[in-house]
Amino acid sequence: MFLTSPFESCIVLSSLIAGLLFSLSTGFVGILGVFASLFETELSVSPKRLSLSSLSWPKTFWALLSSVEGVSWESSLFACIVGCCFAVTVIASLSASRVFGTVASSFRDSSCCCDSSPAVSVLATPATAALALLSLLLSLPCWSTSTEAFTVDPSPSVFSMLANRITIGL
């Protein structure tokens, strides 16, 4: 409806898909390692840290996160880095889609009076908001909880082996 030429819609949609695939490939290994580390260690919830005053959102979320023990500190730090990389790649790729939409509008037929920038905004703004919110939610547990809430697991985890292989590969 908003995209008047097939060339323009193809460029905008392909740039959005490419940005999504790039951001997912950036965070996929890190998220896998974090979940492997979380499920490999025993998780114990301490009811003493939960109080009746922390029943409102987002206090309940913070209290539940701070009551979880057995999560290694390196997995939380890596999840924070993955969340930041995810947000940066998504925002950069969707900004590139706006540039591609502007370039596509210059190649369009001059007889059409419609501008393509509203169409690109209609497609890019909800996708930017949704993916940036997803990346922020992925990295919130690492930013919100203190390092005292995490206990270091001395046994080598799947995350540690993944991190060592990535470091050796680099």
Curated annotation (Swiss-Prot):
Residue ranges annotated as Cytoplasmic topological domain: 1-15, 98-119
Major localization listed first in the record, in broad terms: membrane
Disulfide bonds: none
Cellular localisation: Membrane
Keyword terms of this UniProt record: Membrane, Transmembrane, Transmembrane helix
Keyword rRNA-binding appears in the UniProt entry: no
Extracellular topology ranges: 37-76, 141-170
Chain segments annotated as transmembrane: 16-36, 77-97, 120-140
Keyword Manganese: no
Lipid bilayer topology: Multi-pass membrane protein
GO cellular component: membrane
Note: Partially overlaps SWI3.
Protein's name in the database: Putative uncharacterized membrane protein YJL175W
